[in-house]
């Protein structure tokens, strides 16, 4: 059995400055950067690869061996022992890859995110025979490879490769990292030599005893945690070892798993701070070492910075790179940090290959670039494949503020109209922490029209080489002393620039220049004045006066007095003046002496100027300044210490006395008030209000009715708390009857229910609006009874369900307007309804709805904005989200319920959220789900409904806004609602039925309560087809009437639409839709059983005649049910005693057809 043998290899990664090509600090250990080109083929590919890896032992990044030819020598790869990233062997024709000393692949970078070792497509086919392979990889000599720390292996499309299928990869890879293994054998028959008979398990990389696979894990004893050098427990390697070992100690490792500290493998490097057990303090570690790659080093490379014990390429956000004792480190910024931007390949530009039109603006106002700057042909011409447009050369000036580049600067293309790199005129340092190709940090190639560089501020190229190639017109490059810019002896310059006509300005030193003129000098022969080399500074003459400091001309401060025969100043600032122009306070020249300036200890500083112009301090007792020394020079009153003390004591005493007096007076006032309140409470009556609120009194009138005043007819409905009857109310002392609805409470109801009914009565008695149901009176019997107006057509929900095919868009929009008007009235009265739904809206007639059911309503005071409920049964699916979750009710939560009510109307009585349990409604609303768009609604109507369902109550519309929105839509209903079919006119037969079933002495409740308003009842105006009469649905008249919700056609219409129109069309405004719960039209003497002659006889009976014949003109009823709609209506024109028919007869004025199911008042004859 063969195991690893030999002495321990003490791996010392003393990594230094260059990260480009191979460099070394120890003759036996060399480190090189590696590449990340993947499958890209570069110019001079083999030569660049040979120069990169010759003599290299450790590759920091990736080892990429690609595109080698059959006869090329790869023996320079034999020195490589460790790779930090991945190993790529692809597209090669060479027969052998001699990586015989490679022990460890760390896998810090993975190819395609999965693979650490890739061997693929290493062959070339015979052009004449596609199935015959001429050349290709035959031997992969990884003879000492024993460990891959992370990632998997891929071997595919290598038809000539031998022996690799014998390798046991599970001894090499780490199973804990879940490696991806993609091993695809090739079916091509090849002639391979077998492994040496001494190889364990017949595993080898190539024939011969020196190429057997080295096992360091699978054949170890059970006591070994990781690797071993033999089968015994004593042969286990240290836990910090990687790739095997020669002994059990951490110094016997062939490679280190984490960090190498002078030949000892550790998991961390010595930290900057340690705990001192003697002083019990955290002190600096005298043996500190910095983490650099996989090594612990005493000093970071000069072009790297130190932060938290590590060598990094750039500081993190909020940190500034500074130079301390010759070491560059990261410190927190003092104030605002200079703007640091990502370069190509870093951060936001990690997937970008060059500066282009999409990212050039990201470099605006940047001081430092973390990364690289690359400008190539695609930067300016764009890339159609990636949809990158061309870049305007003027945008390059976004780079003019850049002072430092941590990586490299590569220019492979430049605009023809720019002859220099003057956009980088402020660039001071190129760090070269990453390098281009063969280790270059500054590259200018293929820019043939470039005449000079123009990098006048460049002072340092920290690492990497410089190359200026194919720049035939470039001048002045050979005049530059590049050694002045370099920081290492290994750095070099390559250029093929012109050598003629390269005379620098006379003021430039022998270090050369970046271009013509005194502003392009690398260094000045004499002095530098603001970036311009001059012969001398303005020391004794000239303006402004200057001082010479470190070869620079520095302008004197404005407080320095200009001298003629001597220097005006010795440096910048007011402290370096030879003589002050005004006054001098110590070394500082100032325009005036300190006057009341706040100093240390929050004391004011006062000074005066003596005869020499020197500022001297005033006397300590001078509080207003002084003009000279001593107390005599003080300004203002001079107060001695004793008088000052007396004044202070007197002031304090007076303050205490005043405070005591105020406390006594307040206490006496409080005691007096308590006594007054106590006396008032003991009186039987209070003679004056103690805390007047200022609110107006509620002067609503509540009638107390006797049970004998009304009689019940039939049951309209019943519920948990009582029964509702249809009945007639006959007020005492009056010979009239009023149709009413009587709500009778059950006698067994609880006191709480009685209180809730009284609360409802209070609310209903307090409202007075055409679209809000009023309370007529209350009867306080054993079972409380509420008497309200009777709505003949029942609730709106049942109406739209039963008569879906007969309802038109104008009715729907009118109902929306009227409900919004009623709710707007309640909002103005500070009343929150809390139970608005289609079931709680009643129809007086199809053109007039009223809001009812105030069982849950709450009246808010003037300063209340919301009502907090305490539970109970509530209509969850009509409630706003905040009402469901927090039991909070506002006018805006009523807006939500209004939206659900409108949805019910537009869907003709569909159930909201049907099929969803009530307990899930809150989560459904929070997830953004809402009721769907009704089929008849256009998007305009649905958007208004959706606004009512916004989560934020303040985002929902107010009711007054909803009135305006739906009023506008009601003027043009066919534009906003799409409904098939129309509501037909009332037939004469149904009209006869309504007339014959009416009572002669029935009076409308509104007329009885408000007789002075002369309420003219609204008819139920039918929906007429768009081409029918009397009014076209989409006519200009309908769109321009004053209020589309009112039947104001008689007021607003021109007479031309009524020319030659039959009287039956204008008179048949009574709906033939009825509610069987309110009207029973099945009597045997209805219009079905009457002939036309009998009907006419009925109308000719003498009791229908009126001797007081009124000849005044008739007025169309229109929409006169609502007194607010009677704009322009003159009550005097109405008949006071009856209505004239077409045959000269009158109908009694007391006959109210509306409450017997009639849709409107009758003013024209029935033919």
Swiss-Prot record:
Membrane topology: Single-pass type I membrane protein
Gene coding for it: xmrk
Segments in the Extracellular topological domain: 26-642
InterPro entries, sorted: Egfr_JX_dom (IPR044912), Furin-like_Cys-rich_dom (IPR006211), Furin_repeat (IPR006212), GF_recep_IV (IPR032778), Growth_fac_rcpt_cys_sf (IPR009030), Kinase-like_dom_sf (IPR011009), Prot_kinase_dom (IPR000719), Protein_kinase_ATP_BS (IPR017441)
Protein name per UniProt: Melanoma receptor tyrosine-protein kinase
Described function: Probable receptor with tyrosine-protein kinase activity.
GO terms under biological process: negative regulation of apoptotic process; neurogenesis; positive regulation of epithelial cell proliferation; regulation of signal transduction
Catalytic activity: L-tyrosyl-[protein] + ATP = O-phospho-L-tyrosyl-[protein] + ADP + H(+)
